[in-house]
UniProtKB/Swiss-Prot annotation:
GO terms for biological process: maturation of SSU-rRNA. This is Ribosome-binding factor A. Gene3D superfamilies: 3.30.300.20. It is found in: Cytoplasm. GO terms for molecular function: ribosomal small subunit binding.
Length: 116
């Protein structure tokens, strides 16, 4: 169970990473990425950043992951300057599947309603 500090640091990282992606990263592969959640370990050494992408194409998702992996160092450096933490957490980017799962559920409900 995450305590208050973990959640607070996660919220700050989410806000700052969104800002960094919008203003500092000029890589076209990361355009249109939205940070949906950040989970921080108890010792604040790792932060798993979940993101969603507007495109459902596998090639676009792979390019976005490559762009984020390439920009990881710059994002971590910027976070270190913006946050007052003893050590900046290591960043791990993972695609958030919940958005696509929600779309799938909506589609199933729509099909059920059409069948009636």
């Amino acid at each position: 169970m995450a305590n208050y500090r973990d959640r607070r640091v996660g919220q700050e990282i989410m806000r700052e990473v969104n800002d960094i992606l919008n203003k500092r990263i000029r890589d076209p592969r990361v355009q249109g990425i939205t940070i949906t959640d950040v989970r921080v370990t108890g010792d604040l050494q790792q932060a798993t950043i979940y993101y969603s992408l507007l495109s459902d194409l596998a090639s676009e998702q792979q390019k976005a992951q490559q762009g984020l992996d390439k920009a990881k160092g710059l994002i971590r450096k910027e976070l270190g300057q913006r946050l007052t933490l003893y050590k900046t957490p290591e960043l791990i980017f993972e695609r958030d599947e919940s958005v696509q799962y929600g779309n799938h559920i909506d589609e199933l409900i729509r099909k059920l309603n059409q069948g009636e």
